[in-house]
Regions:
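Short, exposed coil/turn segments at beta-strand boundaries within extracellular/luminal domains
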Residues: 286, 324-329
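A glycine-anchored, Pro-Gly-centered beta-turn/N-cap motif
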Residues: 272, 297-299, 312-319
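Short amphipathic beta-strand segments in non-cytosolic proteins
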Residues: 276-293
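Edge beta-strands of extracellular beta-sandwich domains
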Residues: 242-246, 292, 327-336
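Short, aromatic- and glycine-rich surface loops/edge beta-strands on solvent-exposed regions
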Residues: 230-234, 313-324
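Carbohydrate-binding surfaces of carbohydrate-active enzymes
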Residues: 1-257, 261-275
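Aromatic sugar-binding surface patches on proteins
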Residues: 295-305
């Protein structure tokens, strides 16, 4: 799940109606460009609406971004003022509702239809914002490269870091128009996670990653090919092994129970959602229904296989692989 958001961006319906602002579902507006600025500043904003603020308030939020918010309802303005008075940071633009005074003002920039120039300008604004925020904000996860876009999710004691390579250049397809950079380029970055210790696994490569513990958190290196993305699992302990228990035999029309445990080196259930590949293979070597990818929540997975009337009799194989460290286990059952 997404962690509680400490950065939020308001999409104002009132400003859409009375000032002609808003994205209307497209990515060509100033509001959409502000979202890109936040992304390249390595922030993870949550989208808020006026009714969200009125219903839930702004508790837990540290930074509130208000692009294209020329006109706001009085009660929303009052909520934002209370947020700011309690220490919250407000980032606005040159068109911000005059009843609110922003702590930082983004200069509105219109697209030039030159993709490389527009991206460079927005990334420059992102870097200026980063430098200003350093005095009042601490990044939960950060990247040394703006083109490595990060997103953080959590499950119990574990954190999941998504890293996507956004470095691109003009290609041979539509690049000559200068509006789209459609060819990906490789990119490397250092990722830092504000966490004291832990073990890092690359869920795409299915292996452990070398990570360094530093005073400000956990650090590791990421290499991404053109257009490539990776998911990293960060957890408090190493995976120790797999355990498999299953029904030893079942008649046609019966049921096979398959229980998988992912454990640490002490044999305790692993405190994370670990992706599992489960293969159910008949005596002829063909994968059966039920084969696929499953989550082992807090290290546990329980699956059931219903033996079909036309399934082959004989010795079946269960193949289990956890996709963090790549460990595998094989079991069997007999269909009578």
């Amino acid at each position: 799940e997404d962690p509680p958001a400490d950065v939020a961006l308001l999409e104002s319906f009132t400003s859409q109606m009375f000032a002609g602002r808003g994205t209307y579902g497209w990515g060509r507006s100033w509001e959409a460009d502000v979202h890109l600025i936040l992304q390249w500043a390595r922030l993870q904003p949550k989208i808020l609406y006026e009714e969200t603020i009125l219903r839930d308030g702004l508790e837990g939020c540290r930074v509130l971004v208000l692009p294209g918010c020329d006109v706001l309802p009085r009660d929303v303005v009052e909520a934002i003022r209370r947020f700011q008075a309690s220490g919250g940071v407000v980032i606005g633009d040159e068109d911000l509702c005059p009843a609110i005074r922003a702590d930082y003002v983004l200069k509105i920039r219109r697209r030039t239809e030159k993709a490389d120039a527009d991206k460079a300008a927005l990334q420059a604004q992102a870097e200026e914002l980063r430098q200003w925020l350093k005095s009042c904000y601490s990044w939960p996860v950060d990247s040394s490269e703006p083109d490595v876009v990060l997103r953080r999710r959590v499950a119990g004691e574990a954190e999941y870091i998504f890293a996507i390579n956004d470095r691109r250049t003009y290609g041979d397809y539509v690049g000559h128009h200068g509006r789209v950079m459609e060819t990906g380029l490789p990119c490397s970055a250092t990722v830092r996670l504000r966490r004291q210790g832990g073990v890092v696994y690359d869920l795409v490569a299915r292996r452990q990653v070398v990570a360094t513990c530093e005073p400000e958190g956990l650090r590791w290196e990421v290499q991404l090919g053109p257009g490539e993305g990776k998911v990293f699992l960060v957890c408090p302990r190493e995976i120790g092994g797999l355990q498999l228990a299953n029904t030893p035999e079942a008649p046609v029309g019966g049921r096979v129970c398959i229980d998988v445990r992912v454990v640490d080196r002490e044999g305790r259930d692993f405190p994370a959602v670990v992706p599992i590949y489960l293969g159910i293979i008949d005596p002829a070597g063909k994968e059966s229904e039920g084969t696929g990818f499953y989550p082992a929540c807090q290290g546990k997975l329980s699956a059931r296989y219903e033996v079909a009337p036309n399934d082959l009799a004989g010795k079946w194989t269960i193949r289990v692989q956890e996709l963090a460290s790549g460990q595998e286990l094989v079991g069997h059952f007999v269909v009578r």
